[in-house]
């Protein structure tokens, strides 16, 4: 619950208005899809939602339970997942999926384009650069991998796109 408000009326009735935290991501685990909020709490299971949220895979969850925080992964990976899904949500980027390899390097899928983000370092800068690229329309109609692993490290502001 993000917030609640109570309204009292003269006829002695009470109206309670509850606002939930928005769902910002999903996890596929044991043939189910679990949806979580920006704090990592699992809010729903196997529902149809109107908004597009990224599906996280590539992480080794040992337990996912409704109304509890995502568990069973290294806390640093859980923090990375939450940071990335929150940045995507805040910047209104609708990723199809998010995956992590064994070195905890993040890759997001945006239709036919995969975006290799690398490690958690400078993730805010990487997402800002991705926003600028998406806004420019440079990726429209392309298929391949956009490399932003080194973005924000001070070495260069350019990026590499490998066409398929």
Report the location of each language-model feature:
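Charged, solvent-exposed interaction patches on well-folded alpha/beta domains
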Residues: 3-164
């Amino acid at each position: 619950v993000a917030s609640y408000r109570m309204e009292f009326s003269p006829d002695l009735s009470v109206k309670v208005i509850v606002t939930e935290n928005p769902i910002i991501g999903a996890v596929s685990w044991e043939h189910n899809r679990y949806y979580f909020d920006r704090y990592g709490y699992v809010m729903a299971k196997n529902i149809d939602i109107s908004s597009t949220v990224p599906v996280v895979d590539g992480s080794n969850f040992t337990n996912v339970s409704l109304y509890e925080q995502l568990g069973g992964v290294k806390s640093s990976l859980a923090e990375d997942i939450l940071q990335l899904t929150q940045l995507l949500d805040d910047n209104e980027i609708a990723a199809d999926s998010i995956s992590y390899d064994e070195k905890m390097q993040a890759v997001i899928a945006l239709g036919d384009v995969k975006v290799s983000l690398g490690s958690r370092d400078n993730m805010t800068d990487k997402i800002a650069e991705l926003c600028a690229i998406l806004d420019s329309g440079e990726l429209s109609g392309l298929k391949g991998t956009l490399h932003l692993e080194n973005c924000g490290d001070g070495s260069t502001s350019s990026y590499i796109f490998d066409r398929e």
